[in-house]
A protein has these predicted regions:
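C-terminal extensions of enzymes
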Residues: 1-18, 26-32, 41-42, 146-153, ...
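Active-site pocket-lining/capping segments in soluble small-molecule metabolic enzymes
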Residues: 82-85, 90-91, 95-102, 107-118, ...
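Conserved, mostly hydrophobic/aromatic
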Residues: 24, 57, 92, 134, ...
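Glycine-rich phosphate/ribose-binding loops and adjacent secondary-structure elements
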Residues: 175, 179, 187-305
Length: 376
């Protein structure tokens, strides 16, 4: 993997760059649609590629390990072939899902014992076997196994957890060297900064991760319920320490406003279920604010979903029609809303990149944040 930093914004820490892997070029800042179980919910791969057009999508190690299971993925020749996707994929390590989905999880130094949310069976994740699982899945960018702490989190617990995440990182790195890639292309490995919302812990963790000297770095444990101001404060601290010549990935973030504010602080990569999940609940993101398409005010609004026309659904269907589909609980409504939201997120990061390259990101960002903060 290669990262080229092309331009720094003169009035902020925002950056524009490119990440190059064996599956192609990723233009940063980038948003990665979440394809949890080898699909971005409600979107065909052809629509995803031709219309939404992301350079990279995300898969979840925890979910793919449980179903379809790594044996099937290996027989298929890896996740790219299994899901017919020839662009980049990033997989998380499963640490967050173990934290968020598993009712009965037991964390110890060796690893995490957890109960499957599918059938109640017990499984054990260690830094070593998670590296092996990610080798078999075959994503272009793979993540270290970490513990994601909740918010709020006791200081002493956050410190112990962070130190264990660092020890797990060392085990990941040591084991990865012993497990060759399986499908003839390279995999980049990113470690993860933790430390909850404690400034000193975030500094310690960022220094440890920077010293690990990997090709890219991630920030985890944010967007777990903390106020946005705390998220931004932690991101700022960490970005001051992480090396400038490597991509920075803020995991699980966020709203369109969160994304712009964190680009301002020096983040290059984002993923979040928000555009897809909120779409299925009738929330549409636009450059002028959010729309709850279920509201009665749209019942006889025959204007296009979004006159900007970022994706084909925006001008082919009206707000009234989309509202009707939600009222009738038709699958098509959720699908249209999902394509719209993902298209908008991709437009947003591409516009951000355009304005960074033009040198006027800061005033554009401030205008966009003000506009997007409205409910329509």
């Amino acid at each position: 993997m290669k990262f080229d930093l092309l331009k720094k914004d003169p009035q902020s820490k925002a950056r524009a760059g490119t990440i190059t892997t064996d599956h192609g070029v990723i233009e940063t800042p980038i948003f990665m649609p979440v394809g949890t179980v080898a699909s971005v919910k409600g979107v065909h791969q052809r629509e995803l590629k031709d219309d939404i057009n992301p350079d990279i999508i995300l898969g979840n190690t925890y979910h793919l390990y449980l179903r379809p299971q790594t044996e099937i993925l290996e027989k298929a020749g890896g996740l790219h072939k299994f899901m017919n996707w020839d662009r980049n994929i990033l997989t998380d390590s499963g640490g967050y899902q173990v934290y968020s989905l598993s009712a009965n999880r037991k964390i110890k130094e060796e690893g995490v014992k957890f109960k499957s949310h599918i059938d109640g069976s017990y499984h054990f994740f260690t830094p070593e076997n998670v590296m092996e699982i990610q080798r078999t899945i075959g994503a272009d960018i793979i993540m270290a196994f970490d513990e994601c702490t909740p918010y709020p989190c006791d200081y002493n617990y956050a410190k112990r957890s962070m130190k264990m995440t660092h020890r797990w990182l060392d085990r990941c790195v040591n084991h990865l060297d012993k497990v060759p890639v399986k499908y003839g292309y390279d995999q980049a490995f990113f470690p993860i900064v933790q430390g909850s919302c404690y400034k000193d812990l975030r500094q310690q963790s960022a220094e440890y991760i920077a010293n690990s000297n990997q090709v890219g770095n991630a920030i985890g444990g944010l967007s777990v319920g903390e106020p946005a101001e705390e998220m931004y404060a932690m991101t700022e601290i960490v970005c001051e320490i992480l090396p400038e010549d490597k991509p920075r990935y803020l995991m699980g973030v966020g709203t369109p406003i969160n994304i712009l504010e964190n680009i301002d602080l020096g983040i290059d990569m984002f993923d979040c279920v928000m555009p897809t999940r909120n779409a299925r609940n009738g929330m549409l993101f636009t450059a002028n604010g959010t729309i709850n398409i279920k509201n009665k005010k749209w019942e006889a609004d025959f204007s296009p979903i979004d006159e900007m026309g970022i994706t084909f659904v925006d001008t082919e269907y009206t707000k009234a029609y989309l509202r009707h589909l939600f009222a009738a609980n038709e699958y098509l409504g959720k699908q249209i809303a999902t394509i719209h939201n993902l298209g908008f997120y991709m437009w947003l990061v591409r516009e951000a990149r355009k304005h960074i390259l033009a040198g006027d990101f800061k005033p554009w960002k401030e205008m966009m944040v003000k506009n997007m903060n409205q409910r329509l």
